[in-house]
């Protein structure tokens, strides 16, 4: 294998999309997604916050080959609402979108945060968990008896709304209009709240030290927020 060190990158960051940059040319997958990622990261340039990564590359429907972003299409242009979901960064097979947020030199590694959106990224919002908390994570992110975690299960339910065709090549057809109109706004709103609350707690850890009791209280509130989100979104499933 070949190790790439981000310190050697003139841009100060690296991004990869499945295929081997150092391997045999034109083998592997993800070349078109790489072009999409290139556009997104170069336009942003710096200050890649967890929120930006989760809400931009992870949910982007910019096509690296066709140079077209679905968000720029009007409802009328979308017609019946369906698009062919091929070579976008979020794929039908996507199972999660996660961001590891480390600490600065001299800071406590226990404050390292995993922002975890489990399930199809456009239908799931991120909830933070802390390294220092060990196995203490929100119940909505936990699974029992090999069942799906509640957050994952609900993301799968929402995914079923935007990929409603189950026969033949149905999983290639995304109801983008429904996703954009009925689901993404609620996902982004829920995630913005979660990130704001998580960042506030993390800042207190930096100044006051890691506190497991604060994490437990945060987790309980995160579970309540998830339950409220799930209840609110039930009307989408009942249409």
Which positions does each model-derived feature cover?
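C-terminus-biased signal that marks the final domain/tail of proteins
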Residues: 1-239
